[in-house]
Amino acid sequence: MNYHLGNLQDFNPNLCQQLKRYCYEINGCCQTVHKELGPFLNEYMYQDALEIIFNERAIPHTREYYFSVDFHGQQIRHKHFVDFHVREKIFIECKAVGSLGPEQRQQLWNYMRLTKVRIGILYNFAPIRDQSEHYYLDTDTNIMYFF
């Protein structure tokens, strides 16, 4: 499924500011991991370190949050998982790739759509300068906004 992508700042500046504040602490955790471990490591090492930071800061989370998918009224037998489900409201998908591309974005967007989780963070630890993208899904319209 393709998404209409919009800028949340243009659509709803107040919501955009709220979400940025809400994600600020999580971004700080990711930046700490990147700063201390550096670039070019395995994705799982970054996930392990991020989980340590979440635990140290008492940030509620689930690592490898599994979810089911319904298809034609039946539950598909195999489950997917997102790297982190934080505060029961935010999906974090961790990457360690040269650069974020459409495949990584589409993966996160599909997870958000299938579960109705409205906030998603795509974080790439591999480059020398880390990359972070934030998304908000309007579940009524299926419009994906970046912020």
Q: In which residue ranges do the predicted regions lie?
A:
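Interdomain/boundary linker segments immediately adjacent to catalytic/signaling cores
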Residues: 1-37
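Nucleic-acid nuclease catalytic cores
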Residues: 95-147
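Nuclease catalytic cores
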Residues: 19-24, 39-43, 47, 51
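Conserved catalytic cores of phosphodiester-cleaving nucleases, focusing on short active-site segments
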Residues: 38, 82-98, 111
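A short, glycine/Asx- and small/polar-enriched loop/turn
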Residues: 75-80
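A short acidic/basic microdomain associated with nuclease active sites
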Residues: 45, 55-73
